[in-house]
């Protein structure tokens, strides 16, 4: 047990969350991540479960979780088709 004047032991950079990492530690934190296919799949799976449990699987739910997914879909589809839409917008005659 730590006494009153002692600081708690520092958390290793690998175990820190992204928002807890300082800018000087960021390159070493990124290099410690798992970029294998299973590591990337696990990261997406954790993100999905976090989103699902926070917005979809709640006692008193609302439409906000589904609305965010639809808004992201609209933004991504617009960003992918923007190059095509930009050229059509600049044409004088269709």
Curated annotation (Swiss-Prot):
Subunit f, of the mitochondrial membrane ATP synthase complex (F(1)F(0) ATP synthase or Complex V) that produces ATP from ADP in the presence of a proton gradient across the membrane which is generated by electron transport complexes of the respiratory chain. ATP synthase complex consist of a soluble F(1) head domain - the catalytic core - and a membrane F(1) domain - the membrane proton channel. These two domains are linked by a central stalk rotating inside the F(1) region and a stationary peripheral stalk. Keywords: Acetylation, ATP synthesis, CF(0), Hydrogen ion transport, Ion transport, Membrane, Mitochondrion, Mitochondrion inner membrane, Phosphoprotein, Transmembrane, Transmembrane helix, Transport. One of its GO terms (biological process) is proton motive force-driven mitochondrial ATP synthesis. It holds the Pfam family WRW. The chain crosses the membrane at residues 68-85. One of its GO terms (molecular function) is proton-transporting ATP synthase activity, rotational mechanism. The lineage of its organism: Eukaryota, Metazoa, Chordata, Craniata, Vertebrata. It is found in: Mitochondrion; Mitochondrion inner membrane. Belongs to the ATPase F chain family. It is a single-pass membrane protein. InterPro entries: F1F0-ATPsyn_F_prd. Its main location: mitochondrion. This is ATP synthase F(0) complex subunit f, mitochondrial. One of its GO terms (cellular component) is mitochondrial inner membrane. The modification Phosphoserine is found at residue 3. Component of the ATP synthase complex composed at least of ATP5F1A/subunit alpha, ATP5F1B/subunit beta, ATP5MC1/subunit c (homooctomer), MT-ATP6/subunit a, MT-ATP8/subunit 8, ATP5ME/subunit e, ATP5MF/subunit f, ATP5MG/subunit g, ATP5MK/subunit k, ATP5MJ/subunit j, ATP5F1C/subunit gamma, ATP5F1D/subunit delta, ATP5F1E/subunit epsilon, ATP5PF/subunit F6, ATP5PB/subunit b, ATP5PD/subunit d, ATP5PO/subunit OSCP. The modification N-acetylalanine is found at residue 2. The modification N6-acetyllysine is found at residue 22.
């Amino acid at each position: 047990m730590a006494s009153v004047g002692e600081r708690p032991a520092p958390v290793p950079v690998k175990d820190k969350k992204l928002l807890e990492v300082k800018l000087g530690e960021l390159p070493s934190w990124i290099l410690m991540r798992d970029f294998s296919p299973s590591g990337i799949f696990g990261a997406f799976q954790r993100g999905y479960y976090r989103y699902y449990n926070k917005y979809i699987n709640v006692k008193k739910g609302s439409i906000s979780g589904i609305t965010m997914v639809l808004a992201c879909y609209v933004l991504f589809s617009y960003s992918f088709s923007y190059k095509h839409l930009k050229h059509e917008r600049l044409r004088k005659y269709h």
